[in-house]
A protein has these predicted regions:
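Intrinsic low-complexity, intrinsically disordered or marginally ordered coil/linker segments
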Residues: 1-144
Length: 144
């Protein structure tokens, strides 16, 4: 499939909730492999529910989507389990790179346009996002 968007996400919150999210992604992957169809849980209402090549690790979950990240799906999952997240995504063929943070029910993101280099550098939104990411990771164990 052309125009994959590679996504990596780290969910942050209560350890049991984060473990439940990791199990959810494992379950999605297993259901998709068994049925050869895409699957999303019923509580996911936003965005495109397309994910493939899901890899669940101790700290990060990685997967592919079509062309763009599916932040709305991540929002629904985070809200359902009461966790926050930090996400990175890239679609090199379209020059799309970005980062997102969801905390306290709000998602902030910065897309980086590689063709004009807009979005990074002196962009205050990018630096604000990096500070928000750092504040979420304070006190987190490296394996989480």
């Amino acid at each position: 499939m052309a125009n994959y968007c590679s996504n990596s996400v780290r969910f942050i919150g209560n350890e049991n909730s984060v473990d439940a999210v990791r199990k959810l992604f494992d379950d999605i992957d297993k259901k998709q492999m068994r049925s050869n169809r895409y699957h999303m849980p019923d509580f996911v209402k936003g965005g495109m529910g397309y994910m493939q090549d899901i890899a669940v690790g101790p700290s990060w979950i990685s997967y592919e989507t079509r062309m763009v990240p599916n932040l709305e799906v991540l929002d629904d999952i985070a809200d359902h389990y009461g966790v926050d997240y930090i996400a990175w995504y890239q679609e090199p063929m379209a020059g799309l790179y970005g980062e997102a943070v969801r905390t306290a029910g709000e998602t902030q993101w910065v897309n980086i346009d590689t063709y004009t280099q807009k979005g990074r550098g002196n962009n205050p939104a990018f630096f604000d996002l990096k500070e928000l990411q750092a504040s979420l990771l304070i006190g987190q164990h490296p394996e989480r």
